[in-house]
From Swiss-Prot:
It comes from the Eukaryota. The keyword NAD does not apply. It holds the Pfam family HlyIII. It comes from Sus scrofa (Pig). It is found in: Cell membrane. One of its GO terms (biological process) is response to steroid hormone. InterPro entries: AdipoR/HlyIII-related. This is Membrane progestin receptor beta. Residues 1-75, 133-174, 235-243, 305-319 are cytoplasmic. Residues 97-111, 196-213, 265-283, 341-354 are extracellular. Belongs to the ADIPOR family. Steroid membrane receptor. Binds progesterone. May be involved in oocyte maturation. It is a multi-pass membrane protein. GO terms for cellular component: plasma membrane.
Length: 354
């Protein structure tokens, strides 16, 4: 018996040694990549306030930037937070489909499908922007414009499910006529404001750039969250027992926390150079926004399952299809805006190089 135990302990020890060597094995298996560089070795466009090091050098092959997913640099946490969140959304939705037997062809399901699509879209576009933007100046602008398109798509996807699944009757009777058109416009305005701010202002960025980003996005959030906020407030005033309402509450709280870290460069402002790889504000923003999305998804799945009678009483299939068609119209408008400003950037960079 003692011999068997010692053999097992020996096996565990060997396994532990292999696990400790796993990061080194993975690193050795990847192509040899350039190391990161300090801020003085990259153009001004790529520098972030109070982030002194951990930048990837520009001008390398695309392969390098894709494989930098496994390299230690100042964007890698931003990439992984949204990559893991996208996988979590997919897995949670798939588990719901397997459990509930989702009727794919039903009009009742369409807003939910578009919401999940919009969530995956914004998370994917965001991680691609942070992963690939260091390739060149044009790539930097291009991928961040794509990121902003993803944000507008997610905003409207959220508006759809809040409107169809989460709103209570008192709010619905007052705002149903103009809510979705206004949400679509605010989604496009948010994309336009972010793209224009990126195009118009250069580092070091003035305060006006943040205003162009935050104000349209803030208006979109206030509008999109209004059906949820109204329902949550009434629920808590009456001694809330709804599980979905608690998830919606968490969604709001996590979003507000993420918005703070997006707007303010903390904690790196107080510890310049100490938060280069892990711990700077944009990473915290990504983490809380990911948790916000997962809380929102959980709330919407509960609403989808538990409020079907309310949904079917309010909405005809035709009105649902019309509302969901506007989703693709918003995608087209936001994409066209981003493409137009990208062409302007491309012309400006060409003139600069000539």
């Amino acid at each position: 018996m003692t011999t068997a135990i010692l053999q097992r302990l020996s096996t565990l020890s060997v396994s532990g040694q292999h696990l400790r060597r796993l990061p080194k094995i993975l690193e050795d298996g990847l192509p040899k990549m350039p190391g990161t560089v300090p801020e003085t070795d990259v153009p001004q466009l790529f520098r972030e306030p109070y982030i002194r090091a951990g930048y990837r050098p520009i001008g390398h092959e695309w392969r390098y930037y894709f494989f930098s997913l496994f390299q230690k640099h100042n964007e890698v946490v931003n990439v992984w937070t949204h990559l893991l969140a996208a996988l979590a959304v997919l897995l949670r939705f798939w588990a719901f489909v397997e459990t509930e037997g989702l009727p794919w062809t039903s009009a009742h399901t369409l807003p939910l499908l578009l919401y999940v699509l919009s969530s995956i879209t914004y998370l994917t576009f965001s991680l691609l922007a942070h992963l690939l933007q260091s390739k060149s100046e044009l790539s930097h602008y291009t991928f961040y414009f794509v990121d902003y398109v993803g944000v507008s798509v997610y905003q409207y996807g959220s508006a759809l499910v809040h409107f169809f699944y989460a709103s209570d009757q008192a709010w619905y009777e007052r705002f149903w006529l103009f809510f979705l058109p206004a949400a679509a416009f605010c989604g496009w305005l948010s994309c336009t404001g972010c793209c224009y701010a990126k195009y118009r202002y250069r580092r070091p960025y003035p305060v006006m750039r943040k205003v162009c980003q935050v104000v349209p996005a803030g208006l979109a959030f206030i509008l999109d969250i209004s059906p949820v906020a109204h329902r949550v407030a009434l629920c808590h005033l009456s001694g809330c027992q709804e599980q979905a309402a608690w998830y919606h509450t968490l969604q709001i709280v996590f979003f507000l926390v993420s918005a703070y870290f997006f707007s303010c460069p903390v904690p790196e402002k107080y510890f310049p150079g100490s938060c280069d790889i892990v711990g700077h504000g944009h990473q915290i923003f990504h983490a809380f926004l990911s948790i916000c999305t997962l809380s929102q998804l959980e709330a919407i799945l509960l609403d989808y399952k538990g409020r079907q009678e309310i949904f079917l009483h309010r909405h005809s299939p035709l009105s649902i299809y019309a509302a969901c068609l506007s989703f693709f119209f918003l995608v087209a408008c936001s994409g066209a805006t981003a493409a137009l400003l990208r062409e302007k950037i491309k012309a400006r960079l060409s003139k600069k190089d000539s």
